[in-house]
Amino acid sequence: MQTIQLIIFVAFVLSRAAASISSFSDPTSIVNINHDANRLSRALAAGQNQTQRSLRQHEGEDRGAIDKADEVVSKMKALMGTAKNVPNNLAALIAKRSKTAGEFVRRPFLVSKLSKRYNIADQLSFSTLKQLDKIDNMRIVDIKNGIKGNKKTPNGMRRKIKHFEGMKTAPQKFLESHVGRDMQRYGKDGSRWLSAGVVTRTTDQGERQILLISSSNPARGDFLLPKGGWDRGEKIKKAALREVMEEGGVCRAL
C-alpha cells in the first residue's frame, strides 16, 4: 500500500511540473504555450508509457522498503534525463521536486530504523538521519571486527586509514595524544578540568551542522563534542583547539 501511495505522489509531482507550462485536453492532444513548452510536452507525452513502466510495482520481489524507495527515485531521475529540451528554470523545479520526493520517501524508513537507538530520530533533519545511518552501518562492521579504541598508547584512539592519493595528514604531534593525566589540571575538589570545542559549518543548502564525535566503544550510541583534559601550561583556547584536531581530525583556527 505504501508503494502505491508513493507512485501516486511521484506522479503528482510530475503532473504539477508539467501543468506549469502546458495542459492536456486528452492523452494525445497538446495545447502549446510556447516553443520550449511544445518540445517538453512532446518529450513527456512520448515517455508516458515509460513512466508507467518505471513506476510499476514489482510483484513477488522481496526487497527492503528503503531499497524500493531508492530505486523509484533513481528511475525518476533517469526519466527526467530523457527530456533534453527542458527550459532551465523548469529543469531546476523538477530537480528540486525530485529531491524533495526522495526525502519524503526515505525519511520515514530512516526514522523507523534509527529510533531503536536514538529516541529523538523523528526530530532530526534528513541530513543528520543519513549520517547516523551511515555511521550505524560502520558500527556493525567495527563490532564484527572487534575494533575498539584504547587509551593505553598515544595513537590507540585513532582509526588507521590506508593512504590514498590526495590525502592530507596532520602533523605528527596532533596524531598522538598524551597518555595519562599527570599533566592535566584539577580543581580543589579533585575534579578534572576539561576543554571542549564547538565546530560548526554551513552547507551549500544553508543547513547549519555541528561536529560531534562518536564513542570509542562501537556498541554505544553516544555522540560528544571533541573534548579532553586541560593540560597545565596551556591556555584554554589552545587546549580546545588541540582536542578538535586530535579527536575530530579537523584543522581550524580560532
UniProtKB/Swiss-Prot annotation:
One Pfam family here: NUDIX
Segments carrying motif RxLR-dEER: 53-63
Top enzyme category: hydrolase
Main location: secreted
Domain Nudix hydrolase: 191-254
EC id: 3.6.1.-
Highest taxon listed in the record's lineage: Eukaryota
Annotated glycan sites: 49
Gene3D superfamilies xrefs: Nucleoside Triphosphate Pyrophosphohydrolase
Residues spanning the signal sequence: 1-19
Cellular component terms (Gene Ontology): cytoplasm; extracellular region; host cell cytoplasm; host cell nucleolus; nucleus
PROSITE patterns: NUDIX (PS51462), NUDIX_BOX (PS00893)
Reported induction: Expression is induced during host plant infection.
Cellular localization per UniProt: Secreted; Host cytoplasm; Host nucleus, Host nucleolus; Host nucleus
Residue span of motif Nudix box: 228-249
Domain notes: The RxLR-dEER motif acts to carry the protein into the host cell cytoplasm through binding to cell surface phosphatidylinositol-3-phosphate.
PANTHER family: DIPHOSPHOINOSITOL POLYPHOSPHATE PHOSPHOHYDROLASE (PTHR12629), DIPHOSPHOINOSITOL-POLYPHOSPHATE DIPHOSPHATASE (PTHR12629:SF0)
Entry similarity comment: In the N-terminal section; belongs to the RxLR effector family.
Reported function: Effector that is involved in host plant infection. Contributes to virulence during the early infection stage, by inhibiting plant defense responses induced by both PAMP-triggered immunity (PTI) and effector-triggered immunity (ETI).
Designated name of the protein: RxLR effector protein CRE5
The species this protein was found in: Phytophthora infestans (strain T30-4)
Lineage: Eukaryota, Sar, Stramenopiles, Oomycota, Peronosporales
Encoding gene, per UniProt annotation: CRE5
